Amino acid sequence: MSCGEPHETDCSEILDHLYEFLDKEMPDSDCVKFEHHFEECSPCLEKYGLEQAVKKLVKRCCGQDDVPGDLRAKVMGRLDLIRSGQSVPEHDVAAAPSSSAPQES
């Protein structure tokens, strides 16, 4: 996504690192670049607002559950694959079969 306007920091870079900004996982100097970008780019600001709302909703609904570290690492790895344009292996996308599901013979 791009608004088509030139910016000091490109829209694609902002969107690629949006969750790092939302989660406060980036240096202050980078945060300043993001804030400046949002001041001049309404499409990115809108996307930021939407993702911020989703994050708050998830926290409110699921905030009491601890996420295992290995699950977080796996999800972040998959997000990195997606952001880099690589495809996620099909076996990682499909739901694992339930133990109560009937077995085919």
From Swiss-Prot:
Interacts with cognate sigma factor SigR under reducing but not oxiding conditions. Treatment with the thiol-oxidzing agent diamide inhibits the interaction, while incubation with thioredoxin (trxA) stimulates the interaction. A redox-regulated anti-sigma factor for extracytoplasmic function (ECF) sigma factor SigR, and a key sensor of disulfide stress. Holds SigR, its cognate ECF sigma factor, in an inactive form, inhibiting its sigma activity under reducing but not oxidizing conditions; oxidation and reduction of the anti-sigma factor is reversible. Mycothiol (MSH) is competent for reduction of RsrA, allowing it to bind to SigR. In conjunction with its cognate sigma factor SigR may sense the intracellular level of reduced MSH. Probably releases SigR during oxidative stress. The keyword Cytoplasm does not apply. Signal peptide: none annotated. A quadruple Cys-3-Ser, Cys-31-Ser, Cys-61-Ala, Cys-62-Ala mutant has anti-sigma factor activity and is induced by diamide. Its cofactor is Zn(2+). Zn(2+) binds at C11, H37, C41, C44. Belongs to the zinc-associated anti-sigma factor (ZAS) superfamily. Pfam families: zf-HC2. One of its GO terms (biological process) is sporulation. Keywords: Disulfide bond, Metal-binding, Redox-active center, Sporulation, Transcription, Transcription regulation, Zinc. Changing C44A: No inhibition of SigR, no diamide induction of SigR. One of its GO terms (molecular function) is zinc ion binding. Residues 33-47 are annotated as: Contributes to redox-sensitivity. Changing E39A: Wild-type inhibition of SigR, more induction by diamide. Disulfide bonds join C11-C44. Binds 1 Zn(2+) per subunit. Zinc is not required for SigR-binding, but is required for anti-sigma factor activity. Zinc-binding renders RsrA relatively resistant to oxidation. It comes from the Bacteria. Changing C61S: No effect on sporulation, normal induction of trxCp1. This is Anti-sigma factor RsrA. Residues 86-105 are annotated as: Disordered.
